[in-house]
Amino acid sequence: MTETNAPVHNQPQPAPVKRNEVLRFVYVLNIVSCFAVVLLHTTLPVYSPQPTWHWLEMLSLQSLAIFAVPVFFMVSGMNLLGYRNRYPTSVFFRKRFWRVGKAMLLGSLACYVLFCVFPYSFYGAEQFAGVFGVVDFIKRFLTNQINDTYWFFYSIIYLYVLTPILSLVVHNRRCVEYLLVLTAAISVGLPLTERFGLNPIYVNSLLSWPLFSSVALLYFLAGYYVHTYW
């Protein structure tokens, strides 16, 4: 019997990419996106529409910089979904949860103390007047009611929890494409149909799947797919 080295499944293989080129590419993306995030946060009055040129200027700046958060999710997916080639899952959790969890907790604690001590010195902080306490902090921390701009931390932790599972299937290009199509249909397609007048009652029971309704997951997977297979 003749031996053969041909693979059993003829799956498309990831395209080789030079590491130095990847690092420069990622650095540029992160730097540009950081500036874009600052721009987004300095034009927040855009969410209070007014018929003025100043509001139109802020709207234009928001439109130019809105790519920042999707890029951060894509870069995270590009860097993390192949972590098994570098270290075990225990190291992944220890590195990622410690780094993000520490920043999230300390940042929330600092904001909570500042808002409670100076409730009338920060926009929207009046609700913190006279409520300082451990229980109140825990409740607000668990529900992202301290500094709502920290929503990114909550989203990225969700993706970290999914990463060990996703990392087992991302080496199969067809599986990644299936996940991308499914997540895009649920997280983007369904809300879009509602904008065009479709009553959500007709699709929510059948297609309201929390796992695939996350736009963050869509960008997370897309980052790995674009980097690896394009």
What are these regions (language model features)?
Residues 1-189:
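Membrane-cytosol interface segments of multi-pass membrane proteins
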Residues 69-82, 154-167, 194-230:
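Specific transmembrane alpha-helix
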